Swiss-Prot record:
The gene is ribA. Pfam families: GTP_cyclohydro2. The active site is at 126 (proton acceptor), 128 (nucleophile). It comes from Shewanella sp. (strain W3-18-1). This is GTP cyclohydrolase-2. Its EC number is 3.5.4.25. Belongs to the GTP cyclohydrolase II family. GO terms for molecular function: GTP binding; GTP cyclohydrolase II activity; zinc ion binding. Catalyzes the conversion of GTP to 2,5-diamino-6-ribosylamino-4(3H)-pyrimidinone 5'-phosphate (DARP), formate and pyrophosphate. GTP binds at residues 49-53, 70, 92-94, 114, 149, 154.
Amino acid sequence: MSIKYVATSKLPTPWGVFAMHGFEDTETGKEHVALTFGTLSADEPVLGRIHSECLTGDALFSLRCDCGFQLQTAMQNIAETGCGFILYLRQEGRGIGLLNKIRAYELQDKGANTVEANEQLGFPADMRKYDMIKPMLEQIGVKHVRLMTNNPRKVKAMKEFGIEVVERVPLQVGKNRYNEAYLKTKSTELGHMMSEYHFVDED
């Protein structure tokens, strides 16, 4: 496995002080991060999330997606629970990279949905891989997970790498008029598990 643990530091946040663990993929050069909060147990289910990097949503407050809302809600939920983790994976734009993501956004501005835009650029709908999660979870000592996600591929990936997903915790937040079509596409074409009320316009 090409994932190498590098270092751990404190990360003060609005929800409390997390620990930030740095990892390097020596084959690709990508750097990944695990955030942990509280004392994690290898014997008990731990609340956690696998979160793929989204510069526009996580850092630039974009309303085109639900990523930033999901990240903040996951961190808040973990802090309120008292312990948990987030694996922050550097897989921008479902794996196509930032500049290609901007190209995909340009196509979406012209009418394509998020899947069509990727395909028009010559990419699959979702290029993300999850082989790095096993060594990262081994480093932070987690074997059983209550996974915050709407994406069945993440549940499947954890199970394939021998991580027990005790419960899938839905994370349906951040719906707005700019991302409603995007969320519907994630549900209908990418298989994300979202309830109908998530798409009802709010007054």
